[in-house]
UniProtKB/Swiss-Prot annotation:
GO CC, one annotated term: cytoplasm
Quaternary structure note: Monomer.
Name recorded for this polypeptide: Peptidyl-tRNA hydrolase
Classification via CDD domains: PTH (cd00462)
Catalytic reactions on record: an N-acyl-L-alpha-aminoacyl-tRNA + H2O = an N-acyl-L-amino acid + a tRNA + H(+)
Record carries keyword Acyltransferase: no
Keywords assigned: Cytoplasm, Hydrolase, RNA-binding, tRNA-binding
Annotated EC: 3.1.1.29
Active site positions, chain numbering: 19
Superkingdom as given in the UniProt entry: Bacteria
Length: 186
């Protein structure tokens, strides 16, 4: 089984914020692949289904971002899922809005959710970095906790990620990125 983790903060007040773009992708994948309703487990909202030929558990930690690692560790430990079979979808202020990059391992670039996951399971999991840009003025924390100006474009990108996710899960990272870029340009 694969673990697909969408990072975000719980609560309606954070629903449309940049920090919650991981939740948007997780919800979109669950809908697009007809996963059952999310249930509470492992300090998270969890749903298990299939993404193409891949059995997957989608996890949305029910803790705040800086404590996401606990939920990921519980789900991964319970199902004996190694870090290499975990993919985390998260916001990245170092990328322009709408840019998507994928990597395995590496540093957390100051992202508190990734820092928490690194401490819990190590850093060899896959990361799908979802660009939310940096503010021209003001604080970064204020920026990522503010709502998207164009939430429709975020939902469109989430659907493109979902539509091409099997490429990524099959190990074709370049094909996945190529299709996202091509689709996103349309």
């Amino acid at each position: 089984m694969l673990l697909l983790v969408g990072l975000g903060n719980p609560g309606k007040q954070y629903e449309f914020t940049r920090h919650n773009v991981g939740f948007v992708v997780a919800d979109t994948v669950a809908r697009d692949f007809n996963f059952p309703e999310f249930s509470s487990k492992y300090d998270a909202l969890v749903s298990v289904g299939n993404v193409g030929l891949h059995r997957a558990m989608i996890v949305k930690p029910a803790t705040f971002m800086n404590r996401s690692g606990a939920a990921v560790l519980k789900a991964a430990s319970m199902h004996k899922i190694p870090a290499e079979q975990i993919t985390v979808f998260h916001d990245d202020a170092d990328l322009q809005h709408g840019v998507v990059k994928v990597k395995q391992g590496g540093g957390n670039a100051g992202h508190n959710g990734l820092r928490s996951i690194d401490a819990a399971i190590g850093c060899q999991y896959w990361r799908v970095r979802l660009g939310v840009g940096r503010p021209d003025v003001g604080s970064l924390s204020g920026h990522v906790l503010s709502d998207f100006h164009d939430f429709d474009s975020v939902q469109q990108l989430a659907h493109k990620i979902s539509a091409n996710l099997t490429e990524l899960l099959d190990g074709n990272v370049n094909g996945f990125i190529s299709k996202i870029r091509c689709d996103h340009a349309q």
